[in-house]
Regions:
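Generic beta-strand/beta-sheet core signal
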Residues: 6-7, 89, 97, 144
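Basic/Trp-rich segment in TM-proximal cytosolic loops or flexible interdomain/linker regions
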Residues: 40-42, 100-173
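Catalytic donor-sugar/metal-binding loop of nucleotide-sugar-dependent glycosyltransferases
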Residues: 41, 67, 76-95
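Catalytic cores of eukaryotic secretory-pathway lumenal/extracellular enzymes that build
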Residues: 48, 88-89, 95-107
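Catalytic core and acceptor-binding pocket of nucleotide-sugar-dependent glycosyltransferases
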Residues: 50, 71-72, 141, 146
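Structural detector for helix-capping/boundary residues
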Residues: 55-56, 73, 92
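Short, hydrophobic alpha-helical packing/hinge segments within bilobed ligand-binding/sensory domains
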Residues: 75-76, 105
Length: 173
């Protein structure tokens, strides 16, 4: 792998329930998402500051062009679209200090939400195209960025079909 992410751990796990929550989230992300992706042979996702990449990746992209609020997700999406697979190293551990107050966490999560929306705006079309070209990694990335949008879209479409069927008399209700 020329791009590798690590196990991101909370430096201040015991300081508050908020920082403990972050630690549990990182554990979930590492063990149940990235480790599973490695077993399946699909691309992992970078989350936060604990990652590395080869100089070739930087040259191939023409430098560092990732400046959205969630540049880690942006970097992941762009590389997945371009066919790169991101690996995961469980032995590489980064200890990151996390918010201890709910208000700090809320502000951070609002930034991340905005960042994910920006990534979606810039990369959704290409991820969607990649998904239909057979890239499970593109599908996985879309589901990580915005699972609610796809579930909402599916729900709207299913209800629209049901309404039309019932209005035309083809529905069995």
């Amino acid at each position: 792998y020329e791009i590798v992410t690590c196990y991101r751990n909370s430096k201040n796990f015991g300081d508050s329930w908020v920082s403990a929550g972050y630690g549990l989230w990182f554990l979930r992300e590492a063990k149940y998402l990235n480790a599973s992706r490695m077993l399946l042979g699909t691309s992992c996702a970078i989350s936060g500051t604990g990652f590395m990449f080869s100089h070739r990746i930087l040259e191939k992209r023409g430098g560092w062009h990732y400046f959205l609020l969630t540049e880690d997700i942006e970097f992941t999406a762009d590389n997945i679209i371009n066919g790169e697979k991101i690996g995961y190293s469980a032995k590489a551990v980064l200890y990151d200090e996390q918010p201890v107050k709910f208000s700090q966490s809320w502000r951070q999560r609002m930034r991340w939400t905005r960042g994910n929306m920006d990534v979606l705006r810039y990369y959704c079309r290409r991820l969607f195209r990649g998904m239909f070209k057979g890239s499970f990694s593109c599908y996985d990335m879309l589901m990580c960025i915005c699972p609610g949008f796809f579930l909402f879209g599916f729900g709207v479409a299913a209800n629209a079909v049901a309404i039309v069927e019932n209005m035309t008399g083809h529905g069995s209700w």
